[in-house]
Amino acid sequence: WDLGIGDATSVIFSQGNRAGDLRIVDYYEASGEGLPHYAKVLQDKNYTYGRHMAPHDIQVRELGTGRSRLEVAASLGIRFETVPRVHTSVSGEVEEGIHAARMLLSRCWFDETRCKALLESLQHYRREYNTRLNEFRATPVHDWSSHGADALRYLATWYKPTKPRPV
């Protein structure tokens, strides 16, 4: 999951297998919706869920209610585990997550129909080029494509294949 309030929330539905591959079977993204909406989406999809993984910001308490999104989700029947942070600086964390996602992609199988929006976001995810300095910026562009890519980055940071792939 990549949780957004003003931004999109992105959900990747995946299954690991004994060979260490990851099947990305579905993808859902919406904007401006609260957690009750996503609880209904999960119910309507009628999948059997093992784990729901979310970034560390799920533990932030909302000013209005004093409850975290983690607590709200639990009250709706969604049990999240928090993806551990991989680095102390934001740019370092993003970079390490991008590297983890690149390493994971060779193990992924995508449902092309159900994951079309995710695949498009991954194809358009990029860094902005600074023409004055002749270099790419340290962090990726934050636009429509970053939500699905961030969800994959969190998944890649968390996912540990059960069996190494032969070289």
Segments from the language model and where they lie:
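Mg2+-dependent endonuclease catalytic cores in nucleic-acid-processing enzymes, primarily RNase H-like
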Residues: 12-143, 160-167
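Active-site or metal-binding loop neighborhoods of secreted/extracellular toxin and effector enzymes
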Residues: 154
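Gly/Thr-rich phosphate-binding beta-strand-loop-beta motif of the actin/hexokinase/Hsp70
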Residues: 1-16
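Histidine-centered active-site/metal-ligand motif
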Residues: 147
